Design a protein with these regions (language model features):
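Acidic (Asp/Glu-rich) sequence patches and key acidic residues
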Residues: 1-131, 135-136, 143-153
Length: 155
């Protein structure tokens, strides 16, 4: 990359696909899988009791993340699979499903009153990579009748 390209903040196609990185920071990939239940939740404690699992995060509508942040618009109960962020995405998904598989019917009933989804996260400092999820790891989406979507953040 020449100096004028560097100043514009972009790389040639050859540089992008060569695996050369502009920084000395090692390439990383991080993943997560979270079951989210949100909307108007009458009782977080009751929900937690019925699921038999403590949420990794929860909040009520009107609460704030910090003093200067906007208030939350809805209640949230969420559980993130306890997997090392560097493990492949399918490990996160499989762990999440193994936690909630036996609670499927209750989650389907909940969907009639509140939103239930699976939030997948993919974060990397590499702008020329992808991810792969084996078909065997897609059962949670089929069984809970929720879309497969991934939040992708490249830093």
């Amino acid at each position: 990359m020449n100096d004028s390209d560097s100043e514009r903040g972009w790389r040639t196609r050859q540089e992008a696909f060569s695996g050369e990185e502009d920084s000395d920071e090692p390439t990383y990939f991080k993943y997560s899988a979270t079951l989210r239940i949100f909307g108007t939740i009458p009782g977080h404690d009751e929900l937690t009791g019925r699921l038999g699992i403590e949420p990794t995060h929860s909040h009520r509508a009107g609460e704030r993340r910090s003093q200067n942040s906007e208030p939350y618009k809805h209640d949230m109960w969420s559980y993130t699979a306890p997997v090392n962020k560097h493990e492949p995405l399918h490990v996160h998904i499989d762990t999440l499903w193994s936690t909630f598989r036996t609670r499927k019917e209750y989650l389907l009933q909940l969907k009639k009153k509140v939103n239930v989804d699976v939030f997948l996260g993919y974060r990397s400092n590499c702008d020329h990579a992808g991810l792969e999820v084996p078909h065997t790891s897609l059962a949670i989406f089929l069984e809970l009748e929720v879309p497969f979507g991934v939040s992708i953040i490249v830093t």
